[in-house]
Amino acid sequence: MKSVITTVVGAADSASRFPSASDMESVQGSIQRAAARLEAAEKLAGNYDQVAQEAVDAVYNQYPNGATGRQPRKCATEGKEKCKRDFVHYLRLINYCLVTGGTGPLDELAINGQKEVYKALSIDAGTYVAGFSHLRSRGCAPRDMSAQALTAYNQLLDYVINSLG
């Protein structure tokens, strides 16, 4: 896997020149974004259970039977713990994405095929949207993390919300 540094240096070398000031700014920006993602990952890693519980509470406060539509959500009848387990799973994948700097873990382990699975199990994906939307609106900089870290976290929440919608 190539890093932004090797890419910039390689491009400059191919052009028989030293890296320019804008090349260095690009590298610096990439490093700052990586630091923000790692900050968000660290904060999230220490609070999976609490964050997931907030999402579950938001879902059940808004939808007492655990469903946004006509069908009751499977995890509403089987208990809040299974809903929490699902949120923790997504949050761990979001954490992996923050560390890697891409959406690969979410795509491979959650998003690909999720609508078909939820439909087959009669799970209303809208409840996940409600929970993740609550988490997105709840985040606050600098209380929870820096503004740049919160932006990276919120981008991944948006990615999950849009995939479920």
UniProtKB/Swiss-Prot annotation:
Pfam families noted in UniProt: Phycobilisome
Upper taxonomic lineage: Bacteria, Bacillati, Cyanobacteriota, Cyanophyceae, Synechococcales
Domain of life: Bacteria
Bilayer topology annotation: Peripheral membrane protein
UniProt cross-references to SUPFAM superfamilies, sorted A to Z: Globin-like
Post-translational events: Contains three covalently linked phycourobilin chromophores.
Binding site for phycourobilin 2: C83
InterPro entries per the UniProt record, alphabetical: Globin-like_sf, Phycobilisome_asu/bsu, Phycobilisome_asu/bsu_sf
Keywords: Antenna complex, Bile pigment, Chromophore, Electron transport, Membrane, Photosynthesis, Phycobilisome, Thylakoid, Transport
Family per record: Belongs to the phycobiliprotein family.
One cellular-component annotation, GO: phycobilisome
Main function: Light-harvesting photosynthetic bile pigment-protein from the phycobiliprotein complex.
Binding site for phycourobilin 3: C140
Protein name as it appears in the record: C-phycoerythrin class 2 subunit alpha
GO biological process per UniProt: photosynthesis
Amino acids binding phycourobilin 1: C75
Location relative to the cell: Cellular thylakoid membrane
Organism encoding this protein: Synechococcus sp. (strain WH8103)
